[in-house]
Amino acid sequence: MYVIMVYDVNQRRINKVLNTARKYLEWIQNSVLEGEITEAKFEMLKREIEIIINEEEDSVIFYIMRTTKYSERQILGIEKNKREQIL
């Protein structure tokens, strides 16, 4: 499956969330990561993130796509992390 992760967390936890997510997904730009991931690894990622965040203050959103066949990425402005693979 293909996952896009978007997060808005307290500044004290940003680095922990980013470093954890980068073990599974590719950093795209500030607070956004994406990539192919197995369901098992996705569950591991969610468990690790749940341990880090404070659910009273922080927000993490996962967009899950079973296929990227019909998706397209359009970028306005600079691309923060240039990639070969297009969503």
UniProtKB/Swiss-Prot annotation:
GO terms for biological process: defense response to virus; maintenance of CRISPR repeat elements. It is an enzyme of class 3 (hydrolase). SUPFAM superfamilies: TTP0101/SSO1404-like. GO terms for molecular function: metal ion binding; RNA endonuclease activity. Disulfide bonds: none annotated. Its cofactor is Mg(2+). The keyword Hydrolase applies. InterPro entries: CRISPR_associated_Cas2, Virulence_VapD/CRISPR_Cas2. Its EC number is 3.1.-.-. Pfam families: CRISPR_Cas2. Keywords: Antiviral defense, Endonuclease, Hydrolase, Magnesium, Metal-binding, Nuclease. The keyword Nuclease applies. It comes from the Bacteria. Mg(2+) binds at residue 8. Homodimer, forms a heterotetramer with a Cas1 homodimer. CRISPR (clustered regularly interspaced short palindromic repeat), is an adaptive immune system that provides protection against mobile genetic elements (viruses, transposable elements and conjugative plasmids). CRISPR clusters contain sequences complementary to antecedent mobile elements and target invading nucleic acids. CRISPR clusters are transcribed and processed into CRISPR RNA (crRNA). Functions as a ssRNA-specific endoribonuclease. Involved in the integration of spacer DNA into the CRISPR cassette. Belongs to the CRISPR-associated endoribonuclease Cas2 protein family. HAMAP family: Cas2 (MF_01471). This is CRISPR-associated endoribonuclease Cas2. It comes from Dictyoglomus turgidum (strain DSM 6724 / Z-1310). The lineage of its organism: Bacteria, Pseudomonadati, Dictyoglomota, Dictyoglomia, Dictyoglomales.
